[in-house]
Amino acid sequence: MITLALSKGRIFEETLPLLRAAGIEVLEDPEKSRKLILTTNQPNVRVLVVRASDVPTYVQYGGADLGITGKDTLLEHGSDGLYQPLDLQIAKCRISVAVRADFDYASAVKQGSRLRVATKYVAISREFFAAKGVHVDLIKLYGSMELAPLVGLSDAIVDLVSTGNTLKANHLVEVEHIMDISSRLVVNQAALKLKQAPIRKIIDAFASAISQ
């Protein structure tokens, strides 16, 4: 049995064509089904529906053989024990620093002000600001990041940005681009040794699909 860990939403939808390229069709819609283990047209392949932030953990500890997760999640989680054979080039976005439109971020940084930054990407933010020599107090949030500057909780946020429409709707502007993000295929290294042929077949099919 090959077990693939996926999260609902954009990554799941953009993974379906890659699975089809590997001859795998998911037989149930995760948005409609309450099941957390989904069957496929391949009797030896199943899909686990987990939180995006939990995908690396399931793969690392053997709950799943493979998983698909964003580069952002891997950087926050750490990638010990995970083999990363492919950048799948799906679910593309970026991690950016954003502030209220009326906040002079450049002056605050230049003056050496200590900034309060709200984010769920604490590790990424800490490394980024440390490299720039900017002093920050990081506030860990799990959602609705755009709210933090609007109510005075923070001076800035570090968050995923896709179109930028949510920032604009909340009168925020991007002031720094930290990195581009896309989703990666991650593989449990022990599973790769024990189930090499079927896992390699999936990896090769994905690689062929993204090169077209």
UniProtKB/Swiss-Prot annotation:
Highest taxon in the source lineage: Bacteria
GO cellular component, one term: cytoplasm
Localisation: Cytoplasm
Enzyme Commission (EC) number: 2.4.2.17
Catalysed reaction, written as an equation: 1-(5-phospho-beta-D-ribosyl)-ATP + diphosphate = 5-phospho-alpha-D-ribose 1-diphosphate + ATP
PROSITE patterns in the record: ATP_P_PHORIBOSYLTR (PS01316)
Enzyme class: transferase
Keyword Metal-binding: no
Pathway(s) per entry: Amino-acid biosynthesis; L-histidine biosynthesis; L-histidine from 5-phospho-alpha-D-ribose 1-diphosphate: step 1/9
Keyword ATP-binding listed: yes
The protein's role, per its UniProt record: Catalyzes the condensation of ATP and 5-phosphoribose 1-diphosphate to form N'-(5'-phosphoribosyl)-ATP (PR-ATP). Has a crucial role in the pathway because the rate of histidine biosynthesis seems to be controlled primarily by regulation of HisG enzymatic activity.
Notes on the domains: Lacks the C-terminal regulatory region which is replaced by HisZ.
Subunit structure: Heteromultimer composed of HisG and HisZ subunits.
Name of the protein this chain belongs to: ATP phosphoribosyltransferase
Gene from which the chain derives: hisG
